[in-house]
Curated annotation (Swiss-Prot):
Record-level Gene Ontology MF annotations: structural constituent of ribosome
Family statement drawn from the similarity comment of this UniProt entry: Belongs to the universal ribosomal protein uS2 family.
Top-rank lineage group of the source organism: Bacteria
Coiled coil: none
UniProt name for this protein: Small ribosomal subunit protein uS2
Annotated organism of origin: Rickettsia akari (strain Hartford)
InterPro entries named among the record's database cross-references: Ribosomal_uS2, Ribosomal_uS2_bac/mit/plastid, Ribosomal_uS2_CS, Ribosomal_uS2_flav_dom_sf
Region Disordered, residue ranges: 264-295
Annotated SUPFAM superfamilies: Ribosomal protein S2 (SSF52313)
Swiss-Prot/TrEMBL GO biological process terms: translation
Pfam families hit by this protein: Ribosomal_S2 (PF00318)
Signal peptide region: none
């Protein structure tokens, strides 16, 4: 059983997870996740965000525990570096620049591009191999390598389709989501008030634009993956002292087991009274602080 800790509503509030988009930009399919509105901005129900985040974290934990591969995807500017940082920390995979059409559904072509990238790197690192090339040709090869790295650096060791897709901003990453749906790859995603949660197996209602929010999500995702990796390596008898040093290699070398797709969670039920009180008190405290600042 997972030992993923419960998500703290105050932590979500401090990171601005509750701020949705302007009410005029909402997607009605997100109605059940919206607490209300303030100053023409939708406020996300963090009681549901906290509960559904725990469910999503458990899905990540179980996937990695069973030797599965998790692919993190967010190509928006404010998330790009953060998603790469935390995916690398937990030994998983990522796409943080342009999503190339067919990255999942046309893997043969993508694998060919990865092979091309590997060959370019080997050539450019070998002084003898560069003999006979002009400066312009070497410069062209370097540019091609950098262009390929932007798209492929985070998946170059991904030898097959992932077992779980984790997305921040479902609107921007709709192509990745559509490809995952076609291949029956379960999806964890942060869904803002302008998002469509229909194809998301593990939705997390939350702000998908704030850097603080994005960093919080990624930290929680990475922690869950690392806990799953720890359990996987314990079961395999791997020296835990060497875990962080060999995180990526340990994941790549293991056989992949398919995580069965869980049922969709459209709305959490029976949120306990303590959680209700915590959320409402936190919102009230925020309002009081705002009024004090404006006094």
């Amino acid at each position: 059983m997972s030992n993923i800790s419960s998500v703290n509503i105050k932590e979500l509030l401090d990171a601005g997870v509750h701020f949705g988009h302007k009410t005029s930009r909402w997607n009605p399919k997100m109605a059940s996740y919206i607490y209300g509105e303030r100053d023409d901005v939708h406020i996300i129900d963090l009681r549901q965000s906290a509960a559904l985040m725990s469910v999503a974290l458990n899905a990540i934990y179980e996937t990695v525990k069973k030797d599965g591969k998790v692919l993190f995807v967010s190509t928006k500017i404010q998330a790009s570096d953060i998603i790469a940082e935390y995916a690398e920390k937990c030994g998983q995979y990522y796409v943080n620049h342009r999503w190339l059409g067919g990255m999942l559904t046309n893997w043969k072509t993508i694998a060919g591009s990865i092979e091309k990238l590997n060959k370019l790197e080997k050539t450019l690192e070998n002084a003898e191999a560069l003999i006979g090339y002009t400066k312009k040709e070497i410069l062209d090869m370097s540019r091609k390598k950098e262009k390929l790295l932007l798209s492929l650096a985070g998946i170059r060791n991904l030898n097959s389709k992932p077992d779980l897709l984790v997305v921040i901003d479902t609107n921007k990453e709709h192509i990745a989501i559509n490809e995952a749906v076609k291949l029956n790859v379960p999806i964890v995603a942060v869904v803002d008030t302008n998002s469509n949660p229909d194809n998301v197996d593990y939705p997390i209602p939350g702000n998908d634009d704030s850097i603080r929010s994005i960093r919080l999500y990624c930290r929680l995702f990475a922690d869950a993956a690392l806990q799953g990796l720890e359990e996987s390596m314990k079961a395999s008898g791997v020296d835990m002292g060497a875990m962080h040093e060999h995180t990526d290699n340990a994941l790549i070398s293991k056989n992949v087991s398919k995580l069965k797709q869980a049922k969709k969670f459209s709305k959490t039920k029976n949120i306990d009274e303590e959680t209700n009180t915590e959320f409402e008190q936190a919102l009230n405290d925020t309002d009081e602080n705002k009024n004090a600042d404006n006094a």
